[in-house]
Curated annotation (Swiss-Prot):
Recorded catalytic activity of this chain's protein: 2 D-alanine + ATP = D-alanyl-D-alanine + ADP + phosphate + H(+)
Lineage of the species this protein comes from: Bacteria, Bacillati, Bacillota, Bacilli, Bacillales
Record GO terms (molecular function): ATP binding; D-alanine-D-alanine ligase activity; metal ion binding
Key words, A-Z: ATP-binding, Cell shape, Cell wall biogenesis/degradation, Cytoplasm, Ligase, Magnesium, Manganese, Metal-binding, Nucleotide-binding, Peptidoglycan synthesis
Annotated compartments: Cytoplasm
InterPro entries: ATP-grasp, ATP_grasp_subdomain_1, D-Ala_lig_Van_CS, D_ala_D_ala, Dala_Dala_lig_C, Dala_Dala_lig_N, PreATP-grasp_dom_sf
Taxonomic superkingdom: Bacteria
Official protein name in the record: D-alanine--D-alanine ligase
Amino acid sequence: MAKENICIIYGGKSAEHDVSILTAQNVLNAINKDDYQVDIIYITNDGAWKKKDDITENVEDVDSLRLEEVEEGEISNLLTNSSSGQPYAAVFPLLHGPNGEDGTIQGLFEVLDLPYVGNGVLAASSTMDKLVMKQLFAHRGLPQLPYVSFLRSEYEKYQSNILKLVKDKLEFPVFVKPANLGSSVGISKCNNEEELKSGIEEAFQFDRKLVIEQGIEAREIEVAVLGNDYPETTQPGEVVKDVAFYDYKSKYLDGKVQLSIPAELDSEVQTTLRNMAAEAFKATDCSGLLRADFFVTEDNQIFINETNAMPGFTQYSMYPSLWENMGLSYADLITKLIELAKEKHVEKQKNKYKID
């Protein structure tokens, strides 16, 4: 049987650029190259698109994926011309953060009518924006912790009023987050007003909108979701930290985080978490994959924290580990995601685009 053509896209104009490259290395080394002919497209920090065809060997040096010697190409040509001359069975965007995980590149795929792995424009954009995501969860009745959100322009004009609002509505510690970033980039844990001001300034370096959330003493529990219209969920896993805050460095660089899979939880709590993860998936009209993150208190109160529409596939990642625990290997998970992308594209072709 002939190999299917797959294009993996990574890098991107985002603060999570390096995380994306790590994810690409992991996927390239795990994908079944007997079944797929794999081309890669690297998007530089400046937005240039560079392509390398027919990757047959594992990638040992992650920096080799930066494709510094490759010339920039025309985007539409790169996406529509595979190394074999056949159309791509699917493109696999491994882009994290703005300009990749937020619906922008998904819109490009839709315009070009390409099958692609993961969430569509609506789901990607709504799960990327923490405020919109929280509003959709509230509409679905999913329990959340109190929060405050505001724009950079509002803070510049009404700083004292906003700080008062935060102190009136929330108690220290609080977490300050850019609304449109993941991997804990730009996030600060703040224990007092001075740290709050500093955290706000830090977050506004990455986004024009931020969310400040109530801190809580709780376990951090995550559930993986996979599917299209009828999603499946995993047993929950737990993030066990050697640090006070699970930030970018501890996630990807230091290895100061351990994953406990499955998490030690009552069966009733596990069932509730899995049901809530599926509800979160449906609330934002997801397809392909999603990771849902929760807080579980000592007395088993459950709060949804956020969802991640493109969880990383690095060696520290929870998402593939949760499916491994369910009996689905990393390579088979990648294959399943490609099949879901093709399924979603076939479903889309049933739509009429003209009136007879």
